[in-house]
């Protein structure tokens, strides 16, 4: 069996672990702009996204997800808490995965093992994501990247909010052809990435 196929099967098997409740349906995916996506596995099955969740209110969001549509949304405080607990989590994985879970803000970190592979389950009130130890470590190693990206995005949240309000006002006044009205308005700048992504992902989509 080649390595990529092994990784695909391992990702699939982690979903079936008893800690992952398959009755939990994925929630509707948020619209994020100006984002970055980091693949957490060689297959890209699991990922970490960071971008501005378009409101109102708009805010910077960190999300861990998979290609089945599951996404776990984290605040910066929860992400930092998870990072600060990394040594305790690694210690638990090295010793006994049958111990008590670790609480990080709204998250519960549980542990398991399957076929000699140590697993980490991130459990919130409505989403559960299972990952291997190596995937968890890959994610944690992105901490400085997340910190820098978060700071950059946080500086433009107010601009995004202002654009959303302007475009929304135009769309509510021009019900027949809101898309063209937005593009023709003085508020739209086709050479600005905020305008382009908002228009393409939010205001130029079928109702």
Q: Where do the model's predicted regions map?
A:
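Short, exposed "boundary/linker" segments that immediately precede the start
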Residues: 2-3
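Positively charged, low-complexity terminal tracts
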Residues: 6, 12-73, 77-207
């Amino acid at each position: 069996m080649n390595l990529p196929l092994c990784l695909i099967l391992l990702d699939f098997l982690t979903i079936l672990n008893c800690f992952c409740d398959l009755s939990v349906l994925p929630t509707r995916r948020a619209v994020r702009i100006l984002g970055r996506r980091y693949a957490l596995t060689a297959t890209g099955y699991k990922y970490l996204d960071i971008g501005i969740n378009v409101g109102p209110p708009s805010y910077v969001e960190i999300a861990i997800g998979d290609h089945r549509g599951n996404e776990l949304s984290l605040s910066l405080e929860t992400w930092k808490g998870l990072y600060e607990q990394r040594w305790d989590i690694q210690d638990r994985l090295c010793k006994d995965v049958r111990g008590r879970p670790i609480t990080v803000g709204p998250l519960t970190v549980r542990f398991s093992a399957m076929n000699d592979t140590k697993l980490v389950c991130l459990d919130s009130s409505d989403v559960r994501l299972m990952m291997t130890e190596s995937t968890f470590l890959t994610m944690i190693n992105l901490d400085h990247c997340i910190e820098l990206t978060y700071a950059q995005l946080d500086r433009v949240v107010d601009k995004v909010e202002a654009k959303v309000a302007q475009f929304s006002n135009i769309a509510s006044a021009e019900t027949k052809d809101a898309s063209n009205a937005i593009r023709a308005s003085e508020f739209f700048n086709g050479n600005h990435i905020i305008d382009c992504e908002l228009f393409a992902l939010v205001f130029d989509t079928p109702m």
